[in-house]
């Protein structure tokens, strides 16, 4: 799955109309572009409220115990109602599956992963905003002639985890990973 979210007016102007990675533009406005090669579940919750799920949503936990399966828009109504009442940051941890979501509420954008962080979501602060991606090669740091390494990330990859950096780190100093129960806004 390839997903890239571009935030910030200057970044959007730079990338607008450029399909440098051969993936579809899902959403496009003055200060936000969402691109993906994966079919997504898109739902318009209300006026100026939209949510995209990239990946697979299995169900939602009710009362933190029972799992209610979801498969279509009518099944997602419980999720939408909960988001309207409690907010996306309180509801997303009760949604089961392997996914990345993009929630647009008027001029505010929230991006995150499922409660277990099963799909990595990387971000790089860039110009006046940020660029988030499911893959490192979709971020602009690679275009820089001098790549700087994150020493903590390198140490964890070599000594602690054996193959990868700690959850919020990457091997690169300018690129971070969205942590568990964390939203990029």
Predicted feature residues:
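Cysteine-centered catalytic environments shared across enzyme families
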Residues: 1-185
């Amino acid at each position: 799955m390839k997903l890239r979210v571009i935030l910030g007016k200057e970044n959007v102007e730079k990338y607008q109309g450029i399909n440098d990675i051969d993936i579809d533009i899902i959403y496009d406005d003055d200060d936000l572009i969402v691109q993906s090669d994966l079919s997504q579940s898109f739902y318009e919750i209300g006026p100026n409220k939209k949510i995209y799920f990239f990946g697979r949503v299995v169900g939602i936990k009710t009362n933190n115990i029972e799992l209610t399966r979801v498969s279509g828009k009518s099944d997602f109504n419980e999720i939408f109602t909960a988001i309207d009442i409690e907010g996306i940051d309180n509801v997303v941890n009760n949604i089961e599956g392997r996914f990345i979501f993009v929630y647009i509420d008027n001029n505010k954008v929230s991006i995150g992963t499922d409660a277990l962080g099963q799909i990595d979501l990387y971000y790089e602060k860039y110009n006046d905003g940020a660029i988030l991606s499911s893959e490192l090669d979709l971020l602009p740091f690679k275009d820089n002639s001098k790549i700087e390494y994150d020493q903590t990330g390198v140490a964890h990859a070599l000594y602690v985890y054996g193959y990868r950096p700690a959850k919020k780190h990457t091997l690169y100093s300018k690129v971070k990973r969205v942590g568990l129960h964390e939203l990029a806004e």
